[in-house]
């Protein structure tokens, strides 16, 4: 099974769940590689990361871009050393709030040459449980602020105070290569540390690799890495730290959305999936 993205139009990225050969346009040119879901694409190391496709998603949403820096690339054994996230307001001219923290890790850090975070800073950083709690508060604060901005009268204020978490605007969490790495690494770490991941059950997830496939990467030498997209869209990128990558990814996606006269959330809606966290977490526990 594959999620095929036929390209971007003013109606959004045209995607469908199907199987078969690669998708080509009317001239036979390759438009997009299939984004594979389930056991063939979304995986924890060598295990499947179970996903549930979203058939229809048109409600209010709040978009965040996430990035992790880690001790290595093996989600089954490496650990998070930095967690960052940036809110993407509906107005692309607005900056949006940002969250960033270094995280204490005990695994051997083989990726210092990538992120450049000193061992002393990692050793003195908050543990993952503390960082995760702060991250959840950051997301919830943005949700409440968004609700507050949409309510005016005193009666609406009372209604806002009685809202259940399930009634908040949907959190849409985007990451580049997120299905294979960032989301998988995050869930692995939460399960390993015996922490709750129930909030993630209410969120939707977008892997922006699918966007790269939809818009085509032939002009970038076939490279779909974030660094290639950044260079291809003339976006400045600082040192490879998590928050810098979040900012760069937001700029790339906003640039694509603007070029098609669309809002960023509308651009990404067709790519949103739910992660079957219970099934995936059960697989983590068997490794």
Write out the residue ranges for each language-model feature.
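Buried hydrophobic packing segments
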Residues: 182, 186, 211, 249-253
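Short alpha-helix plus adjacent loop in nuclease-associated cores
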Residues: 205-221
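Acidic two-metal-ion nuclease catalytic site recognized across multiple nuclease folds
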Residues: 38, 48-57, 230-232, 243, ...
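Short linear loop/turn motifs
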Residues: 126, 204, 240-249
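Conserved non-catalytic scaffold segment of RNase H-like nuclease domains
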Residues: 47-188, 198-199, 223-234, 240
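N-terminal accessory regions of nucleic-acid-interacting proteins
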Residues: 1-64
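Short, surface-exposed basic-aromatic patches at helix termini and helix-loop junctions that form
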Residues: 191-193
């Amino acid at each position: 099974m594959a999620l095929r993205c036929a390209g971007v139009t003013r109606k959004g990225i045209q995607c469908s769940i199907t199987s078969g050969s690669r998708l080509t346009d009317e001239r036979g040119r390759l438009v997009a590689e299939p984004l594979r879901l389930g056991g063939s694409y979304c995986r924890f190391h060598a295990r499947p990361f179970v996903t549930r496709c979203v058939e229809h998603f048109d409600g209010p949403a709040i978009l965040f871009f996430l990035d992790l820096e880690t001790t290595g690339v093996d989600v089954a054994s490496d650990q998070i050393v930095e967690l960052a996230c940036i809110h993407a307001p509906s107005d692309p001219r607005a900056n949006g709030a940002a969250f960033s923290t270094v995280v204490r890790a005990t695994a051997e850090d083989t990726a210092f040459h990538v992120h450049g975070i000193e061992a002393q800073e990692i050793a003195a950083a908050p543990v993952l449980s503390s960082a995760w709690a702060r991250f959840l508060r950051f997301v919830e604060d943005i949700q409440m602020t968004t609700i507050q901005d949409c309510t005016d009268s005193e009666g609406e204020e009372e209604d806002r105070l009685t809202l259940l978490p399930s009634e908040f605007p949907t959190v849409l969490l985007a990451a580049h290569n997120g299905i294979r790495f960032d989301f998988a690494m995050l869930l692995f770490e939460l399960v390993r540390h015996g922490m709750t991941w129930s909030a993630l059950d209410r969120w939707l997830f977008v892997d922006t690799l699918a966007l790269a496939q939809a818009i085509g990467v032939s002009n970038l030498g076939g490279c779909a890495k974030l660094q290639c997209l950044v260079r291809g869209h003339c976006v400045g990128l600082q040192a490879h730290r998590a928050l810098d990558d979040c900012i760069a990814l937001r700029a790339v996606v906003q640039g694509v959305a603007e070029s098609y006269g669309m809002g960023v959330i509308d651009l990404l809606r067709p790519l949103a999936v739910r992660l079957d966290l219970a099934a995936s977490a059960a697989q983590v526990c068997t490794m």
